[in-house]
Amino acid sequence: MEPSPADPLVLIVEDDRSLRLMYREHLLMSGFRTIDAHNGHQALEKARDLHPDAVVTDLAVPGMDGFEFCRALQQLPETRTIPILAVTGHSEYLDDPTRFRHSGIVQVLIKPCEPAEIVRELRRLIHVGPAPLHG
């Protein structure tokens, strides 16, 4: 089934090509349109240009890491309201919830996570919207 222009657009930021392709496939099958980036700089450019409805980002991507990328999104008026779902293999990141909040990250999933879990969280986030930032 071809995605419709009315389907939500999700930016996938993942340096692991196989994961990026798997996320893309599952999102397309679940009624999302996708764009992807393999590093934070490329992701920021695509987010500014294409205004996705949500972002799924790994936190350990080359160049500008996922936290820096998310903070950069929060600083731009045109991207600051985009809900961000982070996926990471670093469970120790969960020890510092303020780091997520200050980066604008709304939800975090620990890898390995099921693509269905990503789809479920994205559906929730797109309808709920981003959490307000508390400084």
Task: Mark where each language-model region is.
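Active-site residues of response regulator receiver
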Residues: 58, 88
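Receiver (REC) domain active-site loop signature in two-component systems and cognate sites
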Residues: 61
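C-terminal output helix
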Residues: 113-122
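Active-site beta3 strand of CheY-like receiver
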Residues: 50-56
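Charged docking surfaces used in two-component/phosphorelay signaling
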Residues: 21-29
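Conserved acidic carboxylate
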Residues: 14
